[in-house]
Amino acid sequence: MARIAGINIPDHKHTVIALTAIYGIGKTRAQAICAATGIAEDVKISELSEEQIDKLRDEVGKFTVEGDLRREVTLNIKRLLDLGCYRGLRHRRGLPVRGQRTKTNARTRKGPRKPIKK
């Protein structure tokens, strides 16, 4: 198994799909990485040479991925909470942040229904 950005990349998958196993790399960014390194998207990771894997490591290293990205997202949310702005309050209360309706939906964010005691 190849190890890129501290993650074991699955060998049996195509390069584009295997790169999406890294947090912060989706399909579009994986395609861009393959284009920049000159590696075909339909080649499996097990078929790549060590030199090609090193190229992938270097290209992935240019992006904020995995732990650094998770930390950045957490700090951004914490900053909103500290500011006390509307988005921070919505995060604090566990409600949708981006203007979705909450009268009938938003069950994922709000959690299971709580019965009203009479």
Curated annotation (Swiss-Prot):
Keywords: Ribonucleoprotein, Ribosomal protein, RNA-binding, rRNA-binding, tRNA-binding. GO terms for biological process: translation. It holds the Pfam family Ribosomal_S13. InterPro entries: Rbsml_uS13_C, Ribosomal_uS13, Ribosomal_uS13-like_H2TH, Ribosomal_uS13_bac-type, Ribosomal_uS13_CS. GO terms for cellular component: cytosol; small ribosomal subunit. Residues 94-118 are annotated as: Disordered. It comes from the Bacteria. The keyword RNA-binding applies. GO terms for molecular function: rRNA binding; structural constituent of ribosome; tRNA binding. Located at the top of the head of the 30S subunit, it contacts several helices of the 16S rRNA. In the 70S ribosome it contacts the 23S rRNA (bridge B1a) and protein L5 of the 50S subunit (bridge B1b), connecting the 2 subunits; these bridges are implicated in subunit movement. Contacts the tRNAs in the A and P-sites. Belongs to the universal ribosomal protein uS13 family. PANTHER family: 30S RIBOSOMAL PROTEIN S13/40S RIBOSOMAL PROTEIN S18, SMALL RIBOSOMAL SUBUNIT PROTEIN US13M. Part of the 30S ribosomal subunit. Forms a loose heterodimer with protein S19. Forms two bridges to the 50S subunit in the 70S ribosome. This is Small ribosomal subunit protein uS13. It comes from Pasteurella multocida (strain Pm70).
